[in-house]
Amino acid sequence: MSRIARKQQKNLIQAIAIQRMWRLFELAKSEYAEHPDRSERYVQLIRNISMRNRMSIPREIKNRICKHCYAFLVPGNNARYRLKDGYIVVSCQRCGKEMRYPYKKLK
């Protein structure tokens, strides 16, 4: 297999992996209300896909997953979002850890 063909195949595999991660994320959002354990499983599958293909999870998905216990975070249910000193502070209610994401203040 030539170098170009391998590169095209890798790009195709990564595109499929990203599609699957987004689909699992949408399923996790919709299933959380009735089956929170299913949404935890979907998060686990997202992580497995990203590790298997050695690619990062998209930022929008990554911000909704606890970095410590890998719980699916839903604002108001199992996560608390606060704005503090230029950061969004997300507190996981399951493990008690906090994640901080910077944001730009409007001038």
UniProtKB/Swiss-Prot annotation:
Annotated positions binding Zn(2+): 66, 69, 92, 95
Compartments in which it is found: Cytoplasm
EC number: 3.1.26.5
Molecular function in Gene Ontology: ribonuclease P activity; zinc ion binding
A cellular-component GO term for this protein: ribonuclease P complex
Location, primary (coarse class): cytoplasm
Cofactor(s) of this protein: Zn(2+)
BP-aspect Gene Ontology terms: tRNA 5'-leader removal
InterPro entries tied to this protein: RNP4, Rpr2/Snm1/Rpp21
Pfam families for the chain: Rpr2
Signal peptide, first to last residue: none
Catalytic function, reaction form: Endonucleolytic cleavage of RNA, removing 5'-extranucleotides from tRNA precursor
Cofactor: binding details: Binds 1 zinc ion per subunit.
Known partners and oligomeric status: Consists of a catalytic RNA component and at least 4-5 protein subunits.
Stored HAMAP family: RNase_P_4
Function (record text): Part of ribonuclease P, a protein complex that generates mature tRNA molecules by cleaving their 5'-ends.
UniProt protein name: Ribonuclease P protein component 4
Species in which this protein is naturally found: Methanosarcina barkeri (strain Fusaro / DSM 804)
Gene: rnp4
